[in-house]
């Protein structure tokens, strides 16, 4: 898919545009056969899951299982949420291929809508999106985490790549 024209109806949702461009570039120029992306995409994910668990959205159960194993090994929590096609419709635009947010809509599900935007560019490539919007920063010390930016997801990705290698998936 070309880096298509988007209706930027929310200037606070620019990160998902950059992420969509990165996904498109990876597919078209690098020939990737799976995509694992991680981003502080929405505040809505913290409302849903709190600040110690990231949200995961995927189109591929096998890839999700590998990331779940990596998360468990890293002691970082994730929760899979649905890619709800009923929420996808709020991204339809009258003037472009796609709106970049559900701004002006009352449907809610903003973390899902953000992931659905990125999913448009993934198409059929096995993909998982980890929304770390609620987990990137903490104001309290707890376990391995100290106050401030905590690097949530770094250990998870490292452990996931080890799982992939062990299972014979080319990393």
How would you name each of these model-derived features?
Residues 2, 6-171:
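A generic structural signal for tightly packed, nonpolar segments enriched in small/aliphatic residues
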């Amino acid at each position: 898919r070309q880096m298509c024209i988007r209706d930027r109806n929310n200037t606070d949702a620019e990160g998902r545009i950059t992420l969509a461009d990165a996904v498109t570039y990876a597919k078209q120029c690098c020939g990737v056969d799976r995509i694992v992306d991680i981003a502080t995409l929405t505040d809505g994910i913290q409302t849903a899951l709190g600040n110690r668990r990231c949200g995961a959205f995927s189109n591929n159960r096998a890839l999700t299982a590998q990331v779940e194993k990596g998360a468990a090994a890293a002691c970082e929590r994730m929760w899979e949420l649905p890619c709800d096609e009923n929420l996808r419709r709020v991204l339809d635009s009258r003037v472009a291929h796609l709106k970049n947010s559900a701004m002006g809509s009352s449907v809610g599900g903003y973390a899902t809508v953000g992931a659905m935007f990125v999913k448009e560019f993934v198409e059929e490539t096995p993909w998982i999106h980890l929304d770390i919007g609620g987990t990137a920063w903490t104001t309290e010390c707890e376990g391995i985490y100290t106050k401030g930016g905590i690097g949530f997801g770094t250990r998870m990705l490292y452990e996931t790549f080890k799982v992939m290698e062990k299972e014979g998936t080319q990393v």
